[in-house]
Amino acid sequence: MALPGDPRRLCRLVQEGRLRDLQEELAVARGCRGPAGDTLLHCAARHGRQDILAYLVEAWSMDIEATNRDYKRPLHEAASMGHRDCVRYLLGRGAVVDSLKKADWTPLMMACTRKNLDVIQDLVEHGANPLLKNKDGWNSFHIASREGHPVILRYLLTVCPDAWKTESNIRRTPLHTAAMHGCLEAVQVLLERCHYEPDCRDNCGVTPFMDAIQCGHVSIAKLLLEQHKACSSAADSMGAQALHRAAVTGQDEAIRFLVCGLGIDVDVRAKSSQLTALHYAAKEGQTNTVQTLLSLGADINSTDERNRSVLHLACAGQHVACTRLLLQSGLKDSEDLTGTLAQQLTRSVDILQDFDHDVKS
C-alpha cells in the first residue's frame, strides 16, 4: 500500500476528484512533486478539478506559479486541456497570463491547440498577447491555423488584426500550415481576411499550393488557384514543382489533377537535377505512383543530368516492387555518366534475381 504523502497516490486522488480523501492524506503529509516535477496544482488543473484546485490554493497556500520540469505552470495545464473553470479560477487568483513553458509556449498558444473558444477568450480578455512567438517562431494565430478552427481564427483576427502577419523561423506562414494540414475552412478564412502573397515561399522555396498538393489536399489546391491566383508550375529552391513533390509523397489523385486538370507536362523536369516525377517516385519506392505516371504517358526512358534512368534511382533505394514494375514495363538497364549500371547499385538479392530473369527472358 502506498504510504501517506506518496506523490503518485496524491495525484491519483486529485485526478479522480476525491477531495475528502486528499484532505485526509495532506493532513498527514504535505504533497510531494510527481515524477515530472508536477505539483498537485498541475494535476488538478490538467484534470479539470476546480474544487480541488481551489482547496489546494486556499487551504494549503500552494503556489499557482509553480513550474514543473517543462516549466509548465498550472495555467498551462488548464488551458491546454480546455478546462475553462480552472483557467478562470487561476486568472482570478492573479496567475501570470503570458507565462512561458519549455520551448516558449504561453497558455494562449496551448489553448489554441484545442477548439475551445471560451478559454481563448478568457485568456485574451485577461491580457494574453496573441503576437508572442514560441522558439519555432509560431504565434497563437499560426498554431490555430494548424488546428483549422475557423471561429477561433476569426476571433483572433478580430481582437488582433495583425496576427496573420507572421512567419515561422523558416518563413512558413499560417497559410502554408493550414494548406499542409488540409484545413479547408481555415484556408478560406485566411484568403478572405488576410493578405498573403499568392506564392509566398518558405526557406525551401515551398508555396502553400505545393504544400496542399504534396499532402493530397486537392480541394485546397483548387481554392488557392481560383481565389489566390497561385502558380501551379512554381518551383522550389531545388527546382522541383508541385508535380515532383506529389510524386515523392505518392499523391496519385493530386498528380492526375495536375496533369489532366491543369495540363502540367508529366515529364517536366526539376531545373537543378533534370529529374522527372517518375524519377522522384522511383527514388521513394512509390510503386503505385510510378504506375500512375506511366498510365499518364510518362517517358519510362527519361534520364537525369547524370544520365541516370528511373531504374538507377529505384535500385539505389533498394525498392524491389518498384524495380520489378519498371523491368516488367520494358525498361532496360543502362549506364550512367560514370559507366555504372542500375543493378550495380543494389544489395537486394530479389532485385538482382529480377534482372537475371529479365535478361534470360
From Swiss-Prot:
KO phenotype (gene knockout): No visible phenotype. Loss of Ankrd16 in mice with a 'sticky' phenotype (mice homozygous for the variant 'Glu-734' in Aars/AlaRS) results in early embryonic lethality. Conditional deletion in postnatal Purkinje cells in mice with a 'sticky' phenotype exacerbates the 'sticky' phenotype and causes widespread protein aggregation and neuron loss.
Tissue-level expression: Widely expressed in brain (at protein level).
Domain of life: Eukaryota
Cell membrane is among the record's keywords: no
GO biological process: tRNA modification
Assembly, per entry: Interacts with AARS; the interaction is direct.
GO cellular component, one term: nucleus
SMART domains from the UniProt entry: ANK (SM00248)
Annotated site, Required to capture Ser that is misactivated by AARS/AlaRS, chain positions: K102, K135, K165
Record has Cytoplasm as a keyword: yes
Comment field on protein domains: Side chains of Lys-102, Lys-135 and Lys-165 capture Ser that is misactivated by AARS/AlaRS.
Function: Required to prevent the misactivation of serine (Ser) with tRNA(Ala) by promoting the hydrolysis of Ser-mischarged tRNA(Ala), thereby playing a role in translational fidelity. Binds directly to the catalytic domain of AARS/AlaRS and captures Ser that is misactivated by AARS/AlaRS, preventing the charging of Ser adenylates to tRNA(Ala) and precluding Ser misincorporation in nascent peptides.
ANK repeats: 36-66, 70-99, 103-132, 136-165, 170-200, 204-233, 238-268, 273-302, 306-335
Name this protein carries in UniProt: Ankyrin repeat domain-containing protein 16
Subcellular location field: Cytoplasm; Nucleus
Pfam families per record: Ank_2 (PF12796)
Keyword annotations from UniProtKB, A to Z: ANK repeat, Cytoplasm, Nucleus, Repeat
Signal peptide (residue range): none
